[in-house]
Amino acid sequence: MSLNMFWFLPTHGDGHYLGTEEGSRPVDHGYLQQIAQAADRLGYTGVLIPTGRSCEDAWLVAASMIPVTQRLKFLVALRPSVTSPTVAARQAATLDRLSNGRALFNLVTGSDPQELAGDGVFLDHSERYEASAEFTQVWRRLLQRETVDFNGKHIHVRGAKLLFPAIQQPYPPLYFGGSSDVAQELAAEQVDLYLTWGEPPELVKEKIEQVRAKAAAHGRKIRFGIRLHVIVRETNDEAWQAAERLISHLDDETIAKAQAAFARTDSVGQQRMAALHNGKRDNLEISPNLWAGVGLVRGGAGTALVGDGPTVAARINEYAALGIDSFVLSGYPHLEEAYRVGELLFPLLDVAIPEIPQPQPLNPQGEAVANDFIPRKVAQS
């Protein structure tokens, strides 16, 4: 099985160390462009662009990277409860058309009540997943060119439709990650690829089996991916030294503040990440070559594969043997580490190198009539 390898655009900051200004660098458009172009040339399938108040807007960043890349895909967040499904469907179709079919979408429900309240969302955990399920139903139907009437608990639309279709049919692929039962049920019923954070293989296997069984109950098969950091060097000793350097400027106060912030979220996945290290620096190798140091201060993906090329490749193949075909990777700083992974790791793996997509011809069309329909040629009698 060929593996799809993704990289990450650090729109929330980048540098040599975690939790400090020491060794940080400006993250401007030029720097993000360097990372995107490096990923494009090295053969990564795409890049994940993060979302939330700590990041630059993912959609604008993705759009700005389209003309400076050739084959790289952009995994961009859909935000149920923050954006209406009708607007999100139009945005998705536009991004897919502008990129010639290089758009992918990541369903993000949110987990921090404080941040969600700032965005005007006052739903609890279960309600957010209800809203996300309704959002996804409407979004998918619109991209399949249906005119949609929907009267749900959270989403209400009447006569919703999409005039300009996406390139990818029936709709651009939909990614999603969540560890709770309700999240897994949503994934099983509606998404194309289920993402998990980098837990030890035995825990990942358990998740995959649960989601696969739930999907089968809906008569569906879905793909699987994993989100991990990578610290790969020419030797194992060098890799572990780099891991220790990454957190060498962290103090206990910063760790405690970060863990307190994570504790207020209602994300089951974040709780599982925190439980891997319990906010402590000791015993951070939680599984062979799987290191939890990143999660001391970083929300979301908090583990890294650490080692030389053959060692990290072997660990990746262990996850692949569980059924994972997509690996969303990152490393600090992201420009240099994109090259290290591409040069030290890719030659040891069966990496699916994407081709440059051929331009997709679009049907000629006149201006929309009354903002309601696209004019068609009238048959001559």
Curated annotation (Swiss-Prot):
Keywords: Flavoprotein, FMN, Monooxygenase, Oxidoreductase. The keyword Lipid metabolism does not apply. GO terms for biological process: alkanesulfonate catabolic process; cellular response to sulfur starvation; protein homotetramerization; response to heat. Pfam families: Bac_luciferase. It comes from the Bacteria. One of its GO terms (cellular component) is alkanesulfonate monooxygenase complex. Gene3D superfamilies: Luciferase-like domain (3.20.20.30). Changing R298C: Loss of activity. The keyword Ribonucleoprotein does not apply. Involved in desulfonation of aliphatic sulfonates. HAMAP family: Alkanesulf_monooxygen. Homotetramer. Belongs to the SsuD family. This is Alkanesulfonate monooxygenase. It comes from Escherichia coli (strain K12).
